[in-house]
C-alpha cells in the first residue's frame, strides 16, 4: 500500500469517527505506525498535521450544523469533542474570523 492509500484509508476512518476523541495516539494505534512516522507520512501526503486535519474537519462540520440547524452551540461543540463551548468558540473564531453565533446569524 502506498503512503497516499494509507493516509486516505486513515482519513476515511477519522471522518467516520470524528465525533469521538481523536488524537495522534488513537490514530497511530489504529494505523499500526509509530506516532512519529504517522505524523511525517500524514504531513507529506496532506501538507498539514494530523491535528490540523482533525480540527479543520470538526470545524467544517460545525459550520454546516450552524448553517442548517438551530441546535444550541453548546450541543454542537460537545458532539464534536470540544470540552467546553468557550474552547469551541475560540477555535471557531480563529478559523472563521467570527464567533459561532455571528456565523449562524450572518448567513
Swiss-Prot record:
SMART domains: HTH_ARAC (SM00342). It is found in: Cytoplasm. Its main location: cytoplasm. Residues 8-106 form the HTH araC/xylS-type domain. Residues 25-46, 73-96 bind DNA. One of its GO terms (cellular component) is cytosol. The keyword Plastid does not apply. Keywords: Activator, Cytoplasm, DNA-binding, Transcription, Transcription regulation. GO terms for molecular function: bacterial-type RNA polymerase holo enzyme binding; DNA-binding transcription factor activity; sequence-specific DNA binding. SUPFAM superfamilies: Homeodomain-like. PROSITE patterns: HTH_ARAC_FAMILY_1, HTH_ARAC_FAMILY_2. GO terms for biological process: regulation of DNA-templated transcription. InterPro entries: Homeodomain-like_sf, HTH_AraC, HTH_AraC-typ_CS, MarA-like, Tscrpt_reg_AraC-type_HTH. PANTHER family: REGULATORY PROTEIN SOXS, RIGHT ORIGIN-BINDING PROTEIN. Transcriptional activator of the superoxide response regulon of E.coli that includes at least 10 genes such as sodA, nfo, zwf and micF. Binds the DNA sequence 5'-GCACN(7)CAA-3'. It also facilitates the subsequent binding of RNA polymerase to the micF and the nfo promoters. This is Regulatory protein SoxS. It comes from Salmonella typhimurium (strain LT2 / SGSC1412 / ATCC 700720). The lineage of its organism: Bacteria, Pseudomonadati, Pseudomonadota, Gammaproteobacteria, Enterobacterales.
Amino acid at each position: 500500500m502506498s503512503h497516499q492509500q494509507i493516509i486516505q484509508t486513515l482519513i476515511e476512518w477519522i471522518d467516520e469517527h470524528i465525533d469521538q476523541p481523536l488524537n495522534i495516539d488513537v490514530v497511530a494505534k489504529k494505523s499500526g505506525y509509530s506516532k512519529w512516522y504517522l505524523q511525517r507520512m500524514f504531513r507529506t501526503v496532506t501538507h498539514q498535521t494530523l491535528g490540523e486535519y482533525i480540527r479543520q474537519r470538526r470545524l467544517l462540520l460545525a459550520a454546516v450544523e450552524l448553517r442548517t440547524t438551530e441546535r444550541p452551540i453548546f450541543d454542537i461543540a460537545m458532539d464534536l469533542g470540544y470540552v467546553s463551548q468557550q474552547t469551541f468558540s475560540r477555535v471557531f473564531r480563529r478559523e472563521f474570523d467570527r464567533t459561532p453565533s455571528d456565523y449562524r446569524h450572518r448567513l
